[in-house]
């Protein structure tokens, strides 16, 4: 049987949605609130329902062979600081829970993706900078 993987919400999320805890999924941003990793945080990389552990990006442990591996943390030691509401059913669940306490929840606007034009311009600027450096290096080599 799988464990219910609910994690407490941060104070501002509690106030915003009127709920204390919510199931954690990949993509949520969490913070460790107790234990040896207290204060560390990051995006949830994996939720293992069988073992009841949550793996967070950036929190690793060294294996015997020297490689780094994800460190499983118990959900009761975590706090959600940012919810991933990209899945529609998840937002609907929050909305229904908030309605019980007469809290109206507005659907958050999705974060804007960087435009391809901007990224192409940035790429061209980088290429020009590299080309200028090469010409400077070539000029210095010719002088020496």
Curated annotation (Swiss-Prot):
Cellular component terms (Gene Ontology): large ribosomal subunit
Pfam family, one: Ribosomal_L26
Molecular function in Gene Ontology: rRNA binding; structural constituent of ribosome
CDD domains: KOW_RPL26
Signal keyword on record: no
Composition skew (Basic and acidic residues), residue ranges: 103-134
Comp. bias regions, Acidic residues: 135-144
Transmembrane segments: none
Any GO BP: translation
InterPro entries: KOW, Rib_uL2_dom2, Ribosomal_uL24_CS, Ribosomal_uL24_euk/arc, Ribosomal_uL24_KOW, Translation_prot_SH3-like_sf
Keywords assigned: Ribonucleoprotein, Ribosomal protein, RNA-binding, rRNA-binding
Start and end residues of each stretch annotated as Disordered: 102-144
Record bears the keyword Cytoplasm: no
Record's subunit section: Part of the 50S ribosomal subunit.
Function text: One of two assembly initiator proteins, it binds directly to the 5'-end of the 23S rRNA, where it nucleates assembly of the 50S subunit. Located at the polypeptide exit tunnel on the outside of the subunit.
Family membership noted in the UniProt record: Belongs to the universal ribosomal protein uL24 family.
Designated name of the protein: Large ribosomal subunit protein uL24
Organism in which the protein naturally occurs: Thermoplasma acidophilum (strain ATCC 25905 / DSM 1728 / JCM 9062 / NBRC 15155 / AMRC-C165)
Gene coding for it: rpl24
């Amino acid at each position: 049987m799988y464990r219910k993987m609910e994690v407490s919400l941060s104070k501002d999320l509690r106030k915003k949605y009127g709920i204390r805890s919510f199931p954690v999924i990949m993509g949520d941003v969490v913070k460790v609130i107790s234990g040896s990793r207290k204060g560390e945080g990051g995006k949830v990389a994996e939720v293992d329902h069988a073992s009841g552990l949550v793996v967070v990006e950036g929190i690793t442990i060294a294996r015997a062979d020297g490689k780094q591996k994800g460190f499983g943390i118990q959900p009761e030691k975590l706090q959600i600081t940012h919810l991933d509401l990209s899945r529609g059913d998840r937002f609907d669940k929050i909305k229904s829970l908030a309605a019980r306490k007469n809290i109206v929840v507005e659907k958050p606007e999705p974060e804007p993706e960087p435009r391809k034009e901007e990224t192409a311009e940035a790429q061209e600027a980088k290429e020009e900078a590299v080309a200028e450096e090469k010409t400077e290096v070539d000029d210095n080599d010719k002088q020496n």
